[in-house]
Amino acid sequence: MTIPSALVVGGGLAGMVVARELALRGWRVILLERSRRLGGKAGSDIKNGRLVEHGYHVFPQWYPNVRAIVERIGVQLIDFDRYHFLLPGGYPRKVTVLGPSGLSAMWHYVFNGLLPWYHNILYIYSVLDMISRPLSEKRFLDRVSQIGLIRGKWYTSESVAEMGQENVLKASAIPVYDLSAMTAKRIASYWVRQASPFLSILPGDLQTVFIDPQVRELEELGVEIRYGSEVCDVVMHEGVVTAIGLRDGTELSADIYALCTPIEVTRTWLHDHLYKADPELGNMHFLEAQPMAALYLRLRRELPDLPREHVFLHGSYYALSFIDVGRHWKRLDGEHGGHQLSFISSNYSPLNEVSKEGAKDLLLEEISEYLPITPADVESWELNPNTDVPLFINTIGAWSNRPRPKTTIKNLYLAGDYVKNAIDLACMEGAVSAALEAAAQILSDHGETESLPVVQIPAEWPRALLVLARILIVPFVAVARVIAWLEEKFSPHRPDASEVRIKATPRLQMDSRPPRKR
């Protein structure tokens, strides 16, 4: 019996999952990777003797497929049940938010959140209203933004809208007026149902703790990993793929081909013959991606009262958040370091053409408004602008333009977080879910009927229960809305926010990104 063969293009998380699932079932697999390591955006690089990630990654409880990998390779995650907000000039005072794991956590949020209690009630109700919408509205929800969905609602105050705008941008690099309401509904539904632990992180960097153990698995399964293999062409003949062309002029052939590269790479191969064989793939050109930059600061001195969990800089123009990985990771020499702050800038587009040194100075200038850090306190720094490796963003109407794992070309498959999957967000769980679906489709198409890969879908609360909860709290929401309306109408200084936040709000409402290409 002939052993089936597969060429997997792209050694990111999706490509690794596809390669493993096929190799487990006896396939001969070649994995092509352009760089000198696997992992893609979920990996780390050594720069100046230190490991630097694409950006800090989180592992929520609603990552069942990613957490299955973590459990398989024997890694114990570090769990958090809260996160924090800092306001300019307020350190070390912080606003702590507990994950919505129960009534006590919700009560804490209402009376200890960033906004007064009545705005917090309205914000909670806005989330409840969104996640309780029926699945039959899926098509409508994908064609309206999250902010567009709630703006016309009777319960929406200006502060609630602004809070939602900032949270979305920092979490996904997507402006709230661009984020598909369908994506927002799904992610919120998953998080509300599985809120404990709210967030988890690895006890070390992604490459060493998460990716390298999977690389060893692939090697033990006989997967042939070819580093430094830059693909430049998908060779077609009579409507099927016949080879993958490399930059050095060589061509490689197999029975099936799985393209597991990022969207900005995959769509460069949509030439005449490939497009003609499956015109729907051309819709990938309508999909968008934005950079989410990472800045690492190693400090010379200790900062008192620095939280161990994630911290969001409220009102930050560059949408900054961070975590002190120094207290959770070990250095390359095996010792725990001092403060090593891992920042993410979700609004980095204004700095796209600024030099690394200049961008670092501008980011540090804003960071110093929130933390007592001066340039003299920084022992070393690394900046990953990530403009060459942007994140796919779930804009309005994107779902219909996203490809499925199986193309209409009988031996070509796709995997990656931009491919249609149940998670519907650019994240590790989305990439793994799409990869498992692609692997299952490949095996099914080649006669496999048993032990196919199974995609675990995060649980959600029953809609009937959500609707009931929404109805029961309407009287409280009505009272909160009246108070918020009176405040907005008669309070010129809007006491729901600090003066700093009032000044920051216009900046948050600005769109500093270049016009989108249509």
Name the predicted role of every residue range.
Residues 330-335, 387-422:
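FAD-binding beta-loop-beta segment adjacent to the flavin cofactor pocket
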Residues 187-248, 252, 256, 260:
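Helical element adjacent to the flavin cofactor pocket in flavoenzyme catalytic cores
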Residues 66-67, 71, 76-184, 452-455:
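Mobile amphipathic helical/loop "lid" adjacent to a hydrophobic cofactor/ligand pocket
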Residues 23-47:
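Glycine-rich FAD pyrophosphate-binding loop
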